[in-house]
Amino acid sequence: MVRTRKWLWIILFSGLGVGGAIPVLAQNSGHGYEGYEPAGRFPHSVVVADLNKDGHLDMAIAGSAERKITVLLGDGRGGVAANHSYEVGRGPVWVTAGDFDGDGHPDLVSANSGAGTVTLYLNDGRGRFVKRQELEGFQGPVALVAADFDRDGRVDLAVADTLLSTVLVHRGDGKGGMNLVAQYPAGSRPHILAQTDLNRDGVVDLVVTSLGQHTISVLLGKVDGTFEEPRVVKVKRFPHYMAFADFTGDGHEDVAIVCAGDDTLVLLAGDGKGNLRKLAEFPTGVNPHPVVAGDFTGDGRLDLIVGNRSTNDLTILKRDGTGQFTRLPDVKVPDDPIVLGAGDFNEDGKPDLVLVFASLHRAAIYLGDGRGGFTPMVSSPTR
């Protein structure tokens, strides 16, 4: 597996346990929803990290209709201590974190699809951010990966552009600057971009979904920071988010991918050499988008949970250790879950869940009990 910095928790690779019931967040009449935090209008992406180096997990959320990213600083008890926002370009649909200037603090970068730009904010070390630069030359950037592609100790950036149908790779200079060094085909209408290590060589690989061709493209990384030509794998219609783990127990990284057009989760088995084959399909709710994976029941096995936007519920798939999953009863949530993520927000050693709701313009935290049960975090009435 490619190693990431300790403070960075990427939402797409976290998960939710399945052993207990997940309660619906209660509406507080006259005050909105308890436990919800403002997340910008039509939030579209979230990243979790310790942004102010106080030992507590925080999160940054891209609000696609407000030209801003919202930073929620955690209090270590499952609540939010502060809420700040930062202006970016029009239509921010993705936000991620990486230490672009090498000072040990996670910086933030957003993909602004409407403006055709990428905005980099540098962290001042206290969880406040100063705008460093606006990268141009894009037409429709929709997803980002921040990682050290060439293993020079500096964070680089890959950008999926849905209108250019490419992945653009930028080399970081370790001071907050970036230069475009390569472009790779990504299929028609690339949508989600993620990092993993499918061939177990310790070098970052990239996987990108194509909404136009209903495929994923695997870009195997080389030690010099370049990538091989894409290996294209056909999946179901409209592939969205992915989760990576050894789901089959053979020591190789596999891929679970949600396909919204067929209300299906597709499991692709890896061979440890970068090749993927379709292993199984599992039904979900209607219009699934996010998926997260993790062992939240304490049985040593990774389960999957999918957020279904049109039915406002979660599909829970419990893994049996052979790559097969059993579907547990669906869980209703108050709105359309566009993004899921996880981290130990109340620092009890048990992973918690983050749900981002697009139409409510809010995010909520469910506190995990370590046995698969989750309880919504209740705070003061929202503003």
Regions found by a protein language model. Give the residues of each.
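Bacterial N-terminal signal peptides
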Residues: 9-20
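Blade-edge motifs of beta-propeller repeat domains
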Residues: 21-41, 73-90, 122-139, 171-188, ...
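Beta-strand-rich domains and repeat architectures in extracellular enzymes and scaffolds
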Residues: 37-64
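Glycine-aliphatic tripeptides that mark coil-to-beta-strand junctions in extracellular
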Residues: 55-57, 104-106, 153-155, 202-204, ...
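Hydrophobic beta-strand segments that make up the repeating blades of beta-propeller
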Residues: 59-62, 108-111, 157-160, 206-209, ...
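Beta-propeller blade termini
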Residues: 44-53, 73, 93-102, 142-151, ...
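A short loop-to-beta-strand structural motif that recurs across blades of beta-propeller domains
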Residues: 68-71, 117-120, 166-169, 215-218, ...
